[in-house]
Amino acid sequence: MDDLRQHLRGTTALVLTPDSPGYAESIKRWSDTCEKKAAAVVLPTTAEEVSLAVGFATAHHIPLVVHNGGHSTSGASASEGGLVISLARMRGVVVDPAAKTITAQGGTIWEDVDRAAAVHGLATVGGTVNHTGVGGLTLGGGYGWLTGRHGLTIDNLLAATVVLADGRILRASETANADLFWALRGAGHNFGVVTEFVFRAYDQPNEVYAGLLSYPTHRLPEILAFVNTFEDEGPAQQDQGIFFGFSGDSILAAIFYNGPRAAAERHFAPLLALQPTVNTVTMIPYEQLNTIQNPFATYGGRKSFSGAFVRLPLEVGFFQELLDDYQAMIQTYPEASRTAVLFELVSHTAVLRVPQAAMAYATRGPFYNVGCVFRWENPGLDQTMRAMQQAMMRKVGDRAGAGAHARAYANYSHHDGRVKDVFGENLPRLQQLKGKYDPNNVFKKWLNLLPN
């Protein structure tokens, strides 16, 4: 890679090869299944340096991937023998409290954004695990605890700076390169390297009521009875949420209420009365909200992330069957006991305000995400775990799902996810724009738009 170093000579970019200090850390990912031996890792600090790295890769026909948070379990941010552009040195955040905007560099994680915005009493819709990369979550849609009030992360994206496959650096917004901006919001991983995001921010001066609850599994019918009232709350549901499901031998619930303690405790009284074995719920600053699930989303070990959509009400019989399947799996494979399945209820009211064709993201509807993280240690179980996970998510989609038109949330799509399932009616326009902005399909590791 001497030619690459020469190509970047005079810049502040770092080039790491397998014999470089720091290389091993640079290829670590959230899942050990995605730790690949890249030929080189480039760590730029500017869009111009990103452009140089992209240009080198394309000129020498070197496979290229982009790394931000590294949470993809499909390997989208890892490369065996190719070039990784890691944005880890681009984590600056600038908040404009007067304009209520947040400008975040492409390598930021949500912790960076949450903390910077909180200084000014502001927040935006971000990831519910705060070490997730801003770039990956945003470009695939982006659900968060504030989605009920403010929509998806992409609904709050005002502008982006992107490096294209041909090295050009473009600003994209509703008024500049609007077709590219349309594509970035939902399928952006396929169009270039986004080095800067500008988000709309909202006042968030108050603390929020949030935390974790854990129950023995016999509480399942009572928990579902409460969950199935979620849509009965009317407009009030926009400021609350509950993620619930199972991990190990327990039913877990992460709850959120954007308002005073007294109102929150009234709302969640049916859950609190069930005598949870663990209760960490209290009033916390908003910037701590997206840490409450971190203990279940640690780095290390082998992982596979997948998902489905569901509608309410959820039937006790079906959910018990799903729980039985899960418990049988961890009894057969005890090392998978940290596997978690979460049903994520945040209001879709604001999400549905945006038309389906307004941007590339194509799975808006009156349904909710299910996130499923299988965790194990033995590489020999990779295919078995993925197959069992997919069977479980197919069962969820078939029995409690949202219909054939909405099969997959992009950020929860699996290794073999079909682009038609993710982008639906927006796929033809996406493929046309792909031909315009990346005709040689340089950016293809995440839901390949041009598989042929």
Swiss-Prot record:
Question: Which cofactors, by name?
Answer: FAD
Which species is this UniProt entry from? Aspergillus violaceofuscus (strain CBS 115571)
Which residues does the UniProt record annotate as the domain FAD-binding PCMH-type?
Answer: 34-204
Its Enzyme Commission number? 1.1.1.-
Q: Can you tell me which family this protein belongs to?
A: Belongs to the oxygen-dependent FAD-linked oxidoreductase family.
Q: Which keywords accompany this UniProt record?
A: FAD, Flavoprotein, Oxidoreductase
The record ties this protein, via Pfam families, to: BBE, FAD_binding_4
The protein's job, in short, is: The subsequent chain release by Dieckmann condensation (DKC) could be catalyzed by the TE domain present at the C-terminus of pyvA and/or the alpha/beta hydrolase pyvD, installing the tetramic acid moiety.
Write the signal peptide boundaries.
none
The organism sits in which domain of life? Eukaryota
What's its top-level EC category?
oxidoreductase
Pathway, per UniProt? Secondary metabolite biosynthesis
Protein name, per record: FAD-linked oxidoreductase pyvE
SUPFAM superfamilies, A to Z? FAD-binding/transporter-associated domain-like (SSF56176), FAD-linked oxidases, C-terminal domain (SSF55103)
**A GO molecular-function annotation:** oxidoreductase activity
- InterPro entries in UniProt: BBE, FAD-bd_PCMH, FAD-bd_PCMH-like_sf, FAD-bd_PCMH_sub1, FAD-bd_PCMH_sub2, FAD-linked_Oxase-like_C, FAD-linked_Oxidoreductase, Oxid_FAD_bind_N
